Amino acid sequence: MKYDTSELCDIYHEEVNVVEPLFSNFGGRTSFGGQIITVKCFEDNGLLFDLLEENGRGRILLVDGGGSMRRALVDAALARLALQNEWEGIVVYGAVRQVDDLEELDIGIQAIAAIPVGAAGEGIGESDIRVNFGGVTFFSGDHLYADNTGMILSEDPLDIE
């Protein structure tokens, strides 16, 4: 489904929080939305692989990577796993790599930067916790909508039809 965050903001301005414009699209799907699962990890993506093994239909993995630009938390292998398990997208407050491969995949991926250095894979981090970045506090279960214009967050799903 295509989402227009500008239109959604016009309709639901009282019900949405707008994430500061820090993010760029890296995936092949530039418009995506769904219920978020929050993760906090720093320069280690082992936990992301574990979570993306689950069925992701209608869900977005929202990763607080501390804004680190030293190691990429998402690469092509992780994105392919997410796509295989039907995730709608991945949002990373941090970096990605293998961007040419990422843009070929039909999944939404937004991050703040790209860098060629990969993350550790020890599985250090926490999931289903409150995270805060981009001027917004995110909780697992919230609903996120993203496109080339920006990202918005709502406690409840928005009526898009």
UniProtKB/Swiss-Prot annotation:
The keyword Cytoplasm applies. Gene3D superfamilies: Ribonuclease E inhibitor RraA/RraA-like (3.50.30.40). The keyword Cytoplasm applies. GO terms for cellular component: cytosol. It is found in: Cytoplasm. One of its GO terms (biological process) is negative regulation of RNA catabolic process. GO terms for molecular function: endoribonuclease inhibitor activity; enzyme binding. HAMAP family: RraA. Homotrimer. Binds to both RNA-binding sites in the C-terminal region of Rne and to RhlB. Belongs to the RraA family. PANTHER family: 4-HYDROXY-4-METHYL-2-OXOGLUTARATE ALDOLASE 3-RELATED, REGULATOR OF RIBONUCLEASE ACTIVITY A. This is Regulator of ribonuclease activity A. It comes from Erwinia tasmaniensis (strain DSM 17950 / CFBP 7177 / CIP 109463 / NCPPB 4357 / Et1/99). The gene is rraA.
